[in-house]
Curated annotation (Swiss-Prot):
Name of this chain's protein: Glycerol kinase
Any Pfam family the entry gives: FGGY_C
Activity control note: Inhibited by fructose 1,6-bisphosphate (FBP).
Enzyme class, broadest EC rank: transferase
NCBIfam families reported in the protein's UniProt record: glycerol_kin, PRK00047.1
Residues the entry annotates as binding ATP: T16, T17, T265, G313, Q317, G414
GO cellular component: cytosol
Residue sites binding ADP per the record: T16, R20, T265, G313, G414, N418
Organism: Trichormus variabilis (strain ATCC 29413 / PCC 7937)
Amino acid sequence: MQTSSSGYILALDLGTTGNRAFIFNNAGKIVAQAYKELTQHYPQPGWLEHDAEEIWQDTCWVMKTAIANAQISPSEIAAIGLTVQRETCLLWDKTTGKPLHKAIVWQDRRTAPLCHQLQEKGYAQEIYSRTGLVVDAYFSATKLRWLLDYITGVDLKNVLAGTIDTWILWKLTGGKVHATDHSNASRTMLMNLKTGEWDEQLLEILQIPAHILPQIQPSLGKFGLTDTSLLDTAIPITAILGDQQAALFGHGCDRPGLMKCTYGTGSFLVAHTGSNIVRSQHQLISTIAWTQYNSQENINIGYALEGSMFTSGACIQWLRDGIKLIKTAAETETMANQVDDNGGVYFVPAFSGLGAPYWDMNARGAFFGITASVQPQHLVRAVLEAIAYQVLEVVQAINASCSSPMQRLIVDGGACENNFLMQFQADVLGIPVERPTMRDTTVQGAAFAAGLAVGFWDSYTALVNQRQIDRIFEPGEGSQNAIYNFATWQKAVKRSLDWV
């Protein structure tokens, strides 16, 4: 597995709710880590912003803290891998290095009216054909258009644009490298899925100047060196992946028939489709899994089908911080088990509209079926059940789009800690749910990719074969009721559509 007898890999995971750094040793094990929670800015209902300067400062802090915790020298780090929240984007001044506005987050819905305009003008099919994506405020393109409209009196020759990976790479390299990888670029609604390049026609439709966009490079490759002023040494940055693609890589899902679901702020079910673009008739999106050079220095492209569900872990966070029904996320498991059923209550997790398979920017969240006998436990259980029902809908869509049905679901992310949720997920799917011992698969994927790209490890298969399974949840006695109630949940969803 290893070609390096000593040294370490630094992996950065810059997510929606926080930023993390991990140090991996040559055995592929985590030896140290650091975390910083990220401030969420809600300037208006349906809007969500992040301070890009805060992300950069936190990145510096978690890197230095993780290195200190590992008690190693930065010069011992062989490479850096970077994985990020996708679609979130910003503009910055390349002279001052300062953002021109806060970054607009993937959950932000402010550009829904612009998306409706694109649909009304008949661009939806053209955009899907070229990018594999549906027209939605989720993706970066309309966010960038909004930012360009918002900033006035700025010389565009001085402006750079990018997703979070591009911003952090530019800062890490001291402003020397303005680049992104195919997995992140494929989420902008501006990259041609077949060519792997920015699509000139889409840039024209959205009036986005090509010169402000980063160069697109393979996910595993050479992204430059860290500026020596940062860690007193120049460290190669050798992998960049979107967070869901990094998890796919970390699980070893590198060929058709393998898929995973990450339960984070949202739930994201991704199935590798090999070197072929698979088009779904069921509102799933086609995207890049990851890219890398082969031995002939040609680019190998791996594609994927994805079902993006915008709100899952965010529901649990809302139960805690929004309506203060719980004090900790862990309480939800205990509370859900305190009642025999959902008490007739169904929850629709549409805080930011609905993603796959509905793609309704105007849907909103709701509880249905509340009576005077309903207890807090029923509400909590309804929220957990809704997370699982969303995944069921996407699994059904993937099964209908692929030649053979899914045999098992591999899971990761914070909410997969919840045993009630995982058992209910197995019950509704009717297939085993496999939870690995290593929960941080996203950052593991970034580390593996960076190490393989620099020759720190020589075998992807050997790394993946180290995976250990914590628990397999088999469909149980609750399956019949769970499946029966699914139809009622779907009825609740239909009543939430096109709400605003």
